[in-house]
Design a protein with these regions (language model features):
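Bacterial N-terminal signal peptides that target proteins for export
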Residues: 1-11
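Hydrophobic helical h-region of N-terminal Sec-dependent signal peptides
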Residues: 10-18
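C-terminal motif of bacterial Sec signal peptides marking the signal peptidase cleavage site
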Residues: 20-23
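Conserved catalytic or regulatory cores that recognize and/or transform ribose-phosphate-containing ligands
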Residues: 25-198
Length: 198
């Protein structure tokens, strides 16, 4: 019961964040507020639009997570996708020196939102007892902006009531690749990419 409550709470929080984000800068009538702060989103001016820009959303807090993220990113790049991997392509340590926690949080948030909006596709690692909260927010932003959404899952811990994922999360995806053997999942992803475009 606690697991189900935690899953529901996580889903509600993700939905609230997405709804709050989509309402930023508007008042109750839907008009833009002149006094609200906005996030500057740069377009890829001058870059050729291939439809193959991927934002890779995943937990990146342990070495094993980072290593697996790099393996999956390499598979995408081997098939011609341009991947933004936050652990690799985000801010460099010197850019973050001397910043307050609030400044760091805002910088990372704005960078990641901008990259999600500039992507054509979001690819989300759904492993963990519950999917990573940041990845769920990024998924919500991508889904709300009509991005193509794909996920992978190798972790069996959250299987409950024959629902592997919360329906509010799984409903966002075009396809979720599942295999509890990470190497077999990579093989399945390679097979899919050799026959299909994301």
């Amino acid at each position: 019961m606690k697991k189900l409550l935690l899953k529901c709470t996580t889903a509600v929080l993700c939905i609230l964040i997405v709804v709050s984000f989509s309402a930023c800068g508007t008042n109750e009538t839907g008009e833009e507020n002149s006094d609200s702060e906005t996030i500057s989103v740069s377009s890829n001016d001058g870059e050729q639009d291939t439809g193959k820009r991927v934002y890779f959303a995943a937990p990146l807090f342990s070495q094993s997570e980072k290593d697996y993220n790099l393996k999956l990113t390499k598979v995408h790049e081997d098939y011609g996708y341009e991947v933004f991997l936050p652990q690799r392509d985000g801010y460099l340590a010197p850019e973050l020196e001397g910043k307050t926690e609030e400044e760091l949080t805002q910088m990372i948030f704005e960078k990641d939102v901008s990259e999600v909006l500039n992507a054509d596709i979001i690819f989300v690692v759904l492993d963990g007892r519950v999917p990573d909260e940041g990845a769920c927010v990024e998924l919500g932003i991508a889904y709300a902006n009509n991005k193509r959404c794909y996920g992978i899952k190798t972790d069996a811990r959250s299987v409950e009531l024959n629902l592997d994922l919360n329906p509010m999360i799984s409903g966002c995806f075009t396809k979720v690749f599942k295999d509890y053997d990470g190497d077999k999942l990579i093989e399945a992803l390679e097979q899919y990419l050799s026959e299909n475009e994301l």
